[in-house]
């Protein structure tokens, strides 16, 4: 047990390239991603090195598609002792997804992450925030064996992700 006066911090990292973020959706089409210089691997390596230097651990939320196309990144995260958690399969908003679509996204992401070398996937963070009308997704996550969700934004922003 930790001493009462010892501080504990939680660090989570969204594993995505700069052009995956929701803020660029209107400016950069998915079809153009292959034309852009990827920075994910370089930035991930720098992050893992920084965490190792400080003996720190983090939770890395990874898209299933990244696990499929770059499984070595997931292996490096897991081998360094960090938690690998799910961000779903690919950066698309979960708002408006039916339960069947949401389940398929969860299953596809989990299969990809585990195939890439991640241990048991128990955490989830949606590519965009989960709002009040989507709280049913928390029940689905629990039924699928997830122990926590990090998708709820306590602020009422009109744009998030």
Predicted regions and their residues:
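Catalytic alpha-helical scaffold of carbohydrate-active enzymes acting on polysaccharides/glycoconjugates
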Residues: 1-123, 129-161
């Amino acid at each position: 047990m930790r001493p009462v006066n010892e501080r504990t911090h939680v660090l989570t990292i969204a594993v995505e390239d700069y052009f995956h973020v929701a803020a660029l959706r209107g400016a950069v089409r998915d079809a153009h991603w292959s034309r852009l210089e990827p920075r994910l691997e370089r930035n991930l390596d720098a992050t893992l090195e920084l965490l190792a230097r400080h003996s720190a651990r983090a939770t890395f939320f990874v898209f299933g598609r990244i696990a499929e196309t770059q499984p070595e990144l997931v292996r490096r995260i897991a081998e360094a002792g960090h938690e690998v958690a799910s961000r779903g399969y690919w950066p698309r908003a979960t708002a408006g997804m039916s339960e069947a679509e949401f389940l398929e996204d969860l299953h596809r992401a989990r299969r990809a992450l585990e195939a890439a070398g991640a241990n048991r996937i128990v955490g989830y963070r949606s590519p965009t925030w989960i709002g009040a009308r989507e709280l049913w997704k928390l029940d689905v996550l629990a039924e699928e064996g997830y122990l926590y969700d990090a998708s709820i934004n306590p602020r009422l922003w009109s744009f998030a992700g």
